[in-house]
Amino acid sequence: MKNEMLALILAGGQGTRLGKLTQNIAKPAVQFGGRYRIIDFALSNCANSGIDNVGVITQYQPLVLNSHIGNGSSWGLEGINRGVTILQPFSATEGNKWFEGTSHAIYQNIDYIDSINPEYVLILSGDHIYKMDYEEMLQVHKDNMASLTVAVLDVPLKEASRFGIMNTDSNDRIVEFEEKPEHPKSTKASMGIYIFNWPRLRKMLVDSENGNIDMSDFGKNVIPAYLESGERVYTYNFNGYWKDVGTIESLWEANMEYIAENNPLDSRNRSWKIYSKNHIAPPNFISEHAEVTDSLVVDGCFVTGKVDHSILSANVHMKQGAEIKDSFIMSGAVIGEGAKINRAIIGEGAIIGNNVVIDGTDEIQVVGYNEVVGVSNEN
């Protein structure tokens, strides 16, 4: 049975720029917005776009990510002839081989892709915050009779040198690709989202492997090769909210934008829901001494302090006299009596001792996964 389009989510990144937050978990598994993990956005987009089969390619610290995704039922992706498949590096005849790049990860999973037998493959990154209708992108791909379509976002010219830039003609056909150009000619930045005709991509990957030609990365190798060979390569112009949360600053900023009154992500739009794995938690407890303003407090929280313009994820315990402002507190964290937290990200299960001050006025502060700050080990 042939499936029209298979989605492949690249979720093996370490996310080194997130520092302590990714010491024990993969970047796509990092929490976001109080009740989500970053990969929930790509998975929810797939579900909302009517994609039945999704392969999630993992590598670095996959335990939390694998447990979170499970069989895909939280996104309605389980059932006959549909589902989510976790794809990890495996030992082949030549021995264990890590993925060497984005397109190499696809090549290593050719057997899985062939078992689905798609006409098209949709390549996604598992570490961006956005909503996109991939079915709409596929229609543009078909209308242009394209071999490859690249989703692009218009960025300010002063920021264009940070991205892979697509230079196009008047019909949105890509005529040149520049990787982080010093003097960009265009502001169309690649989002790392691609639709390929699978038979053509498959042939290129197999031929390059057999010929010992480096085709390990989509941006550095595959897209330039497509353009050089005269393939029909087009852009899909995306105009919605999109955030690369690859740094501490951008992750904090995205969470603060998420709780804005005019949320640019439009998270309250029920026609395009963001799904996640459900965890049963007791109701919140907000004491008579607590003061909560302009904040998101998720189930299971115990709040007896002051919270202003912040996110408290599930099961956060905030003791009396503590103050939290402009911060993102991940699930299971404990904030001690009289602690003061400003402009910070507090990791899952972290413990902040009594009267500890964490001030990110000059630079966003981070407390890592299960990290303990200001608590004596003597007891």
Curated annotation (Swiss-Prot):
Q: Which residues form a coiled coil?
A: none
Q: Which UniProt keywords apply?
A: ATP-binding, Carbohydrate metabolism, Glycogen biosynthesis, Glycogen metabolism, Nucleotide-binding, Nucleotidyltransferase, Transferase
- Which PANTHER family has this protein been placed in? GLUCOSE-1-PHOSPHATE ADENYLYLTRANSFERASE (PTHR43523:SF2), GLUCOSE-1-PHOSPHATE ADENYLYLTRANSFERASE-RELATED (PTHR43523)
Any idea which GO molecular function terms this record carries?
A: ATP binding; glucose-1-phosphate adenylyltransferase activity
Annotated GO biological processes are:
glycogen biosynthetic process
Q: Report the protein's function.
A: Involved in the biosynthesis of ADP-glucose, a building block required for the elongation reactions to produce glycogen. Catalyzes the reaction between ATP and alpha-D-glucose 1-phosphate (G1P) to produce pyrophosphate and ADP-Glc.
- Taxonomic superkingdom: Bacteria
According to UniProt, the name of this protein is: Glucose-1-phosphate adenylyltransferase
* Pathway(s) the chain acts in: Glycan biosynthesis; glycogen biosynthesis
What are its E.C. numbers? 2.7.7.27
Native source organism of the sequence = Streptococcus uberis (strain ATCC BAA-854 / 0140J)
SUPFAM superfamilies, A to Z: Nucleotide-diphospho-sugar transferases (SSF53448), Trimeric LpxA-like enzymes (SSF51161)
The UniProt similarity line reads: Belongs to the bacterial/plant glucose-1-phosphate adenylyltransferase family.
Is ATP-binding a UniProt keyword of this protein? Answer: yes
Please name the top-level EC class of this enzyme: transferase
Q: Which Pfam families match?
A: Hexapep_GlmU, NTP_transferase
Positions annotated to bind alpha-D-glucose 1-phosphate: 164, 179-180, 190
Q: Which reaction does it catalyse?
A: alpha-D-glucose 1-phosphate + ATP + H(+) = ADP-alpha-D-glucose + diphosphate
